Amino acid sequence: MTVKVKFPKDIREYARKEKVKDSLIKLTETALAEAISKFHRRMIVLQGDTLNKAKLAGILAGGAARILSEYIPEMLERKLRDTEQIEVLYATDALGEDTYGRKRFEEFRKHFSLLAPTAELTSVTFKHSRDILGRTFDILVIDLSYDYSPNDLGRIIETVRGGGLIFVLTNPFEKWKDMWTGFHKSLVTPPYTIEDVKKRFNRRLIRKFTEHKGIYIVNTDRMSIERKPGKYRSQATLPEREKVEIPKNIRFPRELYELCLTRGQVEVLKTLEELIEKEGMVVLTADRGRGKSVSIGIASVGLAVSSKKKRFRIVVTAPEPENVQSLMKFAKKSLEVLGYKTKVITDNGLIKEVYAKGIGIRYYPPTKGYRQRAELYIVDEAAGIHVPILHRYLEKERVVFSSTIHGYEGAGRGFSVKFLKKAKEKREYKEVHLSTPIRYAEGDPIEKWLFDVLLLDAEPVELTEEDYELIRKMEVYLEEPDLDDWFENDREDLRHFVGIYVLAHYRNRPSDVALLADAPHHEARVLRLKNGKIVTAIQIAKEGGIPKAVIDKMAKGYKPPGNIIPDMMVKHHYAKEFARLKGYRVVRIATHPDAMDMGLGSKALELLIKEAEEKGLDWVGSGFGASPELIRFWVRNGFAVVHLSPTRNPVSGEYTAIVIKPISEKAKEIVKKANEEFRIRLTEWLGDTHRDLEPEIARWLFESPFGEAVNYPIYLTKTQKRRLEMFIKRILTYDTVVDAVKPLVKLYFLDGWMRPYLDERQIMLLIHRVLQAHDWKETAKLLNRTEMYTMVELRDIVRGLWYYYKHLIKDEEGEK
């Protein structure tokens, strides 16, 4: 079906009155005709210094909205949209009174509302852009004139459906490429100033506007087109969606299959039908915008209504409730299509719970969801959740894991690399991959532009057998890349560098790239093979060297931007002099996923420490989510643990650990003392603040690179000593001598390298039963032993420790 794409006569006359050239109207008509015909998006960049750009956006968007509104019935029939309302989104950095962002919005709205009064206009600030996740818009106006973050850019652009237009408001490119934005101001940290902040990311963004198809550029101050289409057009052919055939022998209601827009979604429903009568696990992967969450929302209702149970409870979890809004909305829609009355519970505008007769669907944070009883568990955006927590869901009878491969969620393939490999060892599962976009057709140029500018689809370099030989021989070198060259000339090395993070890390946000590009204290290091291939990527932040006046403020509670390690040392160890010292904080370190466990990470750290030493720095440190593997990695590389956060990260479920490798003599003195203090604190925290800390993590936190015992006197009364002897001789039980055993166990963990040898299981037993005071049943389960065996083993360990340490323990008179 061919349709006319021409501005109505009244809008053309209005535009001329407002001095809008016909060429700009033709440009908009052409962009819209291209978008409709291909079911893609098109972008028009309006660069300028005055309110003209907002006025022009209002007039052109108003005309486009009127054209789209004429063809809503045909688009609904072809399933190109699911609403009769034309929806327009205006996104900006600020909407407060007297802000420039507000003035531009008001100028836009004045013209737009006059020309397209029936369109629904939503305004949102970047800060609240998560509020529009799960919604879809026909037209987007995004104001980048002053402030934005790359995370916002990705999240907002992807809400526009095929056949839609995106208007981008910017400053004149020549001015913009040298401007500092609000995002830049947030990167300033002592001792740096705004003058030190780079502008690489904005320059990359400007360049990418001119490199990709489907993007047109207008200078609104001169009302001239600077990048125009090859051919103007005023007609479009309404496309047809791929015909989706409903399979025979379906078990979910047919009405649910009719909600599917792609064959991939049908496959998801068909796969989940297998969970009606038997337990099982399904893994769903897709790029952003492929209808993954929608499919799960529909299929979860299919399972609930097909179940023989009177009550069907569904637990939904994801890193953030925003991640599951599409799932919840389509679960609600599916229930209503089947004739159910629904009850929805929201929090801050986000759907948290959906109920119908006998069916309950509820969102829980990752650390709480697995504790609930349910018939089905759904883990959405699983790559953003800490692997040990994913393993808790792995134990459930019916569970669905889903993960975005590329997109602003930034999952990467780390989910497959780190979790699914281990999951295969525990249970069988079916995997479904969705490749066809839902909001727009394949090959959308705006998606290509977005993935390119934000490096969402970056991949590491491929490794050959010759490369592995170089790795085995450790023929590598550490290099500081020229970031100006990487970003200005769009080097492949940048994609390979970021690609390592995309594949190796659980979450990789677009703003991480901007931080690397522009933050004055952030730098990159790469471990290259002799042939130049990047195999390990390191992002570092230079910290310390803080002026005395700022340090005094820090000691009173002030938190400077950046400087995470100096700030922690000042507040938790009263080491004000440490903040004057300079060091590298390793922000991220990751090795090529095809070359893991070959010693590259340790080699990269070794060379980084050597570089820091040569540059006269005082320390190298890092902060990270504590897992047994990571703690072990850092400790084995000679780093001392100096801090553990009192609470777990609500998304990852991990405690944050901070480690430091001192280089200068002054740093060694301070860090040694901080490490000793931390170990003393940990012996107490394990029974209180960190009672739920995994013992396999705790045991590595006690390890020290200094090898010396902590000078921390342990006292036992004469009676306690006698009772301890009676426990060893099996006269008294453990529960009656806890007060005497605990100081002895503390002494062991505060000892140096000369402490008696205990194997891994024995160390875990001391931590779990004595320091964390868990009962015999839990401890025996942890160790995979009987309770009786565990009791006997603890007595044997205490006997050995007592004979080894009793000459060091003072009694109340101070005698040994």
From Swiss-Prot:
Acetyl-CoA binds at I589, A590, T591, E629, R636. GO terms for biological process: rRNA acetylation involved in maturation of SSU-rRNA; tRNA acetylation; tRNA wobble cytosine modification. ATP binds at Q265, R439. Its EC number is 2.3.1.193. Signal peptide: none annotated. Pfam families: GNAT_acetyltr_2, NAT10_TcmA_helicase, TmcA_N. The keyword Transmembrane does not apply. It comes from the Archaea. Catalyzes the formation of N(4)-acetylcytidine (ac(4)C) at the wobble position of tRNA(Met), by using acetyl-CoA as an acetyl donor and ATP (or GTP). Catalyzes the formation of 233 N(4)-acetylcytidine (ac(4)C) sites in RNA, on the middle C of a CCG motif. Modifications are found in rRNA, ncRNA, mRNA and tRNA. More acetylation is observed at 85 than at 65 or 75 degrees Celsius. This is tRNA(Met) cytidine acetyltransferase TmcA. The gene is tmcA.
